[in-house]
Regions:
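A glycine-rich helix N-cap at a beta->alpha junction
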Residues: 872-879
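Nucleotide/phosphate-binding sheet-loop regions of phosphoryl- and nucleotidyl-transfer enzymes
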Residues: 187, 843, 851-853
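Short, surface-exposed loop/turn segments at secondary-structure boundaries that line and modulate
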Residues: 823, 849-871
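Conserved, well-folded catalytic cores of nucleic-acid-processing
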Residues: 170, 835, 839, 853-856, ...
Length: 887
């Protein structure tokens, strides 16, 4: 921001004071927000307290930009647009920080003309430059082959999308190394919908061929820089009519943009298969359910909602912006275990007031966005740390009680937020376009209120899906009271804001609030490895686990033992079998043990602390070990000095932990689900939250949120295409607005199992003979790539040969130490892998099977992407996975 090098901000106190004071001063200048100067001072003090004590946080642009001019006199280049309160018109900024860009989310419209597309490109570049994201629906753009007014035919929407994608890839968002954030949407009835669905899938195939030819697999490398479609999230806009046609095995008609005549007709089932398969293979496109979105649209009188921001939480009219903020739910828990409803309401009231002031304080990239943001004033208040909140209260994430809590917290958030908006409207007036949307606004408010009265059995009124929920009465009463008052005040005063809430990802600001979980997400895993600024890693356990165990009634000693089971004691002191005393008796000195001890806090395997580099040659001699012995791939130092395998395993578990709570001492099995995470935990963990658990959570929250919920449904690598279709159908039935999925390892890969497919999607098998295994040998001359590696000082080479399409077909492994038993076994595994690949066994199946296989030698590697390997085979297959199955 051009902050001078002298006298920079050095504390959160300075940061929060700058932001809170600026908002207070601007609110006073605008008038109508505070009854007196004393009230304004109280507002500033309360906002500062909420920010400084991590009760809530604004979106990043507010922290980056707000108050730099007001507090420090810092100026920036002009060119944006803002609403001038004196002239009641949009003006162009001369100083970027007098009216800073405070919104993170933008939606921009685009019409079927070169002028509007060029203007969109210009405004997108400006948004990316200042660190914001934008989304657009390109369905108005005519399809390939449609006539042009001056003669000839259109090159089609995809040709323009490729151009927009190239510009987005050229701009580093906010001047950082992060790429631009962009959403592209196409309606299901667009004539180019099939090519659009396949766009990213086909481009990923090209990337795979380039990578196989030796180009870097890094996302910022030359291979991905060469292909298109890599700089946006892609979504398809799906109406109810398509979903009904799909469920009834019906047809789907596409229409030309210019004359509305019929274009190609498809089987709806075939189209859904393509959407699900593309998402299965490369995570795009996501889906947006159009009729659900329009049903909850507060401003139907102005126009329909066509698009969303890149993360799909801001869902509103074209050419509008939204400033976001999120509350930290954990901060509103009382010591008696109840939720502090009044404190939560007060924080909502303060933040909504602040965000409302920010609307006209801000500037925007185009004149139209500046005007429409002023006219509609949408806000995006949400929350973070839901996963931690539920864990602390002993509530499983995937449970009726967990969903009920999420629903009621969301209901109070929006109900009290709209209530505050109505109160402000009584003082300074409604948003300018309220009257033309009064009917639809009150209609949606009634939908929200009705949902609050059936929060214990949330259902989609149009589809019929429902969820059984369970929630404390005092929370239900608070939610219903807020919506009753909200509706009464709205009917009397109207509303100052057309929208009030979203559930954003909260990635950066969750760190500012010290949250263990982001947005609506559960915890990723109980144990994580935190990278240290000075190098190395530090093992941490979710801090909420111990507190949750205490709330469940476990004694302090039991909690300590459970935590030790998860993360290990991280020290030799007091460990079973292998400890300071037993190691000293073998010949280790205090100095030797200090070196080993220093590695244990971050080690996930005890053997990795007893390798050359940590144990020096002098120590080896004292132990009676010839240094040359350690070069043997089968060498295990702990075994060589007399420890039995069962002793090593017991010490490993005690010192390094299990990474999971499953099987922990004292823990009752009925409590396992409270600690379930998005992924399997540790080496022995088997539990994780199923995909439908994520879908049901989104569905429980959606009826109480103005916008949508930014959340990805994670699926395991083994998930099938049908699993994704089931997720989409269930989400639609439950009234979810937007949905994206990610299957682990889903980049340019093939299905793990045979799925029933329409014969128009791929050729139908003609006979049972075609089901017999067929070996596809490589051509005599083929391309290959060789990779040198080192595991615990043992050097080797991996050579991968490719088919003509760039897919791996053979693997050779060569260890520098020839003639050893391990070298022969590794050569056998390489031959076996080659034959399996040539018989069509998917590489991802082999990677999944052989990754993390543990035997000696193991230890540090020469590859920064795989810093530690549990064995040579572990390294080889993890490298194959990183190289050929993901970005």
């Amino acid at each position: 921001a051009g902050v001078p090098q002298v006298d920079q901000e050095t504390s959160v106190r300075q940061l929060t004071r700058r932001v809170a004071r600026t908002i207070r001063q601007v609110g006073e200048a605008f008038g109508g927000y505070f009854a007196s100067a004393k009230d304004a001072e109280s507002f500033e003090a309360e906002l500062t307290h909420l920010l400084a004590y991590q009760y809530g946080a604004f979106n990043s642009p507010v922290w980056f930009n707000c108050g730099l001019w007001h507090e420090y006199g810092i100026e920036g280049g002009g060119g944006n647009y803002y609403w001038d309160m004196e002239t009641k018109s949009v003006q162009i900024t001369k100083n970027a920080y007098e009216h800073p860009q405070n919104s993170a989310c933008f939606i921009q419209g685009v019409d079927d003309s070169l002028d509007t597309m060029l203007e969109l490109q210009k405004s997108e570049v400006r948004l990316f430059k200042y660190g914001s994201g934008t989304g657009s629906n390109f369905s108005r753009v005519r399809a390939k082959g449609e006539p042009l007014s001056g003669g000839g035919e259109s090159s089609g929407v995809l040709s323009f999308l490729e151009g927009f994608d190239r510009w987005a890839g050229s701009i580093k968002s906010g001047g950082t190394t992060r790429r631009a954030a962009k959403m592209v949407i196409l309606d299901m009835d667009h004539p180019e919908i099939v090519d659009y669905i396949d766009w990213k899938l086909n481009e990923e195939k090209k990337a795979k061929i380039l990578i196989a030819a030796g180009y870097s697999a890094d996302f910022n490398g030359e291979a991905y820089h060469t292909i298109s479609g890599q700089n946006s999230n892609n979504s398809v806009r799906i109406p109810d009519s398509f979903m009904n046609s799909y469920l009834k095995d019906g047809k789907w008609q596409t229409t030309y943009r210019m004359d509305g005549k019929s274009a190609d007709e498809y089987d709806a089932k075939w189209l859904m298969d393509k959407i699900a398969y593309a998402a299965w293979a490369c995570a795009d496109p996501g889906v947006q359910f159009d009729d659900v979105i329009q049903r909850w649209h507060t401003c139907k009188g102005t126009g329909r909602i066509n698009a969303t921001n890149p993360c799909s939480e801001f869902v509103f009219l074209d050419d509008t912006a939204c400033n976001l903020a999120s509350l930290n739910l954990v901060k509103f828990m009382r010591e008696d275990g109840e939720f502090d409803v009044e404190a939560y309401r007060h924080a909502i009231r303060v933040f909504i007031t602040a965000m409302e002031i920010i609307v006209d304080l801000s500037s925007y990239p185009t004149e139209r966005i500046a005007r429409r943001s002023h006219d509609f004033r949408p806000l995006g208040l949400g929350y973070a740390n839901l996963g931690t909140f539920l864990m602390l209260n002993g509530i499983p994430y995937d449970s009726s009680e967990g969903r009920a809590w999420a629903g009621v917290l969301s209901a109070i958030l929006s109900g009290h937020g709209y209530q505050t908006s109505a109160e402000i409207a009584g003082n300074v007036g409604t948003f300018d376009c309220f009257e033309e949307n009064r009917e639809s606004m009150l209609e949606v408010m009634n939908l929200h209120r009705d949902a609050a009265y059936r929060i214990d059995k949330v259902s989609s009124s149009s589809i019929g899906g429902q969820l059984d929920l369970n929630c404390p009465d005092y929370m239900l009463d608070a939610a219903r009271e807020d919506w009753d008052v909200c509706l009464q005040m709205g009917e009397q005063f109207g509303y100052r804001n057309s929208q009030i809430s979203v559930i954003a990802p909260t990635g950066t600001i969750a760190l500012l609030m010290d949250c263990d979980t982001t947005g609506i997400e559960p915890d990723f895993a109980l144990v994580k490895f935190k990278k240290l600024a000075g190098g190395g890693y530090f093992k941490i356990v979710n801090r909420s686990v111990a507190e949750a165990l205490e709330h469940l009634g476990y004694a302090d000693e039991q909690v300590e033992e459970i935590i030790a089971y998860i993360i290990g004691i991280g020290t030799l002191k007091g460990a079973s079998h292998i400890n300071e005393e037993t190691l000293k008796s073998k010949g280790f000195t205090e100095e030797d043990l200090a070196k080993i001890e220093a590695t244990l806090s971050s080690a996930f395997d005890l053997n990795l602390a007893f390798v050359p580099g940590i144990v020096d040659e002098e120590c080896l001699k004292r132990l009676g070990i010839n240094p040359e012995e350690t070069q043997d791939p089968e060498f295990n130092m702990l075994k060589s000095i007399g420890f039995r395998q069962e002793e090593i395993d017991a010490a490993d578990e005690a010192i390094c932990g299990n990474g999971t709570i499953e099987g922990a001492p004292h823990l009752k099995e009925k409590h396992y689900s409270i600690f379930d995470c998005a992924n399997k935990c540790g080496r022995i963990g088997t539990r994780f939250i199923e995909p439908m658990g994520h879908v049901r959570m989104i569905a429980a929250v959606q009826p109480f949120i103005s916008g949508a919920i930014s959340k990805t449904v994670n699926l395991t690598n083994e998930a099938a295409v049908d699993d994704i279709k089931n997720v989409y159908v269930e989400a639609w039935k439950l009234g979810v607005k937007c949905m994206s999925i990610y299957r682990d390892g889903s980049k340019s890969s093939q299905p793990l199992s045979s799925n029933s497919r329409d014969d128009t999607l791929e050729e139908k098998l003609e006979s049972h003979d075609s089901l017999q295994p067929i070996r596809k040998r490589l051509p005599d001359e083929r391309q290959s790539v060789t990779h040198k590696f080192s595991v615990a000082g043992h050097d080797g080479y991996i050579t991968v040969g490719f088919y003509d399409d760039g897919s791996p077909g053979e693997v050779f492994l060569k260890m520098s130490k020839e003639g050893s038993v391990i070298s022969g076994l590794i050569d056998t595994i390489a031959t076996m892998t080659s034959i399996l690949l040539q018989y069509g066994v998917p590489l991802e199946s082999l990677v999944d099977k052989f990754s993390h296989v543990r035997f000696e030698p193991s230890g540090f590697t020469s590859n920064q992407d795989i810093p530690i390997a549990k064995s040579i085979i572990d390294y080889v297959f993890r490298w194959l996975g990183q190289k050929f199955l993901s970005q």
